[in-house]
Swiss-Prot record:
Monomer. Binds 30S ribosomal subunits, but not 50S ribosomal subunits or 70S ribosomes. One of its GO terms (cellular component) is cytosol. GO terms for biological process: maturation of SSU-rRNA. It is found in: Cytoplasm. It comes from Rickettsia rickettsii (strain Sheila Smith). The gene is rbfA. The keyword Transferase does not apply. Keywords: Cytoplasm, Ribosome biogenesis. It comes from the Bacteria. Belongs to the RbfA family. GO terms for molecular function: ribosomal small subunit binding. One of several proteins that assist in the late maturation steps of the functional core of the 30S ribosomal subunit. Associates with free 30S ribosomal subunits (but not with 30S subunits that are part of 70S ribosomes or polysomes). Required for efficient processing of 16S rRNA. May interact with the 5'-terminal helix region of 16S rRNA. Signal peptide: none annotated. This is Ribosome-binding factor A. Pfam families: RBFA (PF02033).
Length: 120
């Protein structure tokens, strides 16, 4: 009988963890980044690596910034090659995964649910 839940392999979880740590280090140092990200504190909420290990979906949440989500996405995408090169040096694999950034809507959804529950 097949499992209904999707589980991630040990390799996926390990690679996601390494990428998460590398992204945190890059954001903390501020090197190799688009200048718009210097005054834009970001939290990497999760990293999900595909089963073939070729794509890393990185979810972020900005705090206290004047930039819009689109501007942050543009700045992250402009820095993508430098970020990928940094990650490539951290992992010892034949191929480095393609990094894709996504805004994490989880916090917004939690606020909406809290407001709905409050209104009950």
């Amino acid at each position: 009988m097949k499992k209904l839940t999707k589980t991630h392999s040990h390799r996926q979880q390990k690679l996601a963890s390494i990428i998460n740590e590398a992204l945190i280090e890059i954001l903390r140092r501020g090197k190799m980044l688009d200048s718009r990200l210097f005054d834009c504190p970001l939290t990497i909420t999760k990293v999900i690596v595909t089963t073939d290990l070729k794509i890393a979906n990185c979810y972020f949440l900005p705090f206290n910034t004047k930039l819009t989500i689109d501007e942050i996405m543009d700045a992250l995408n402009n820095s993508k090659n430098a970020i990928r090169n940094f990650i490539t040096n951290k992992i010892h694999m034949k191929f480095s995964p393609d990094i894709r950034f996504h805004y994490d809507h989880g916090f917004d959804n939690a606020i909406k649910v809290a407001h709905l529950l409050k209104d009950l």
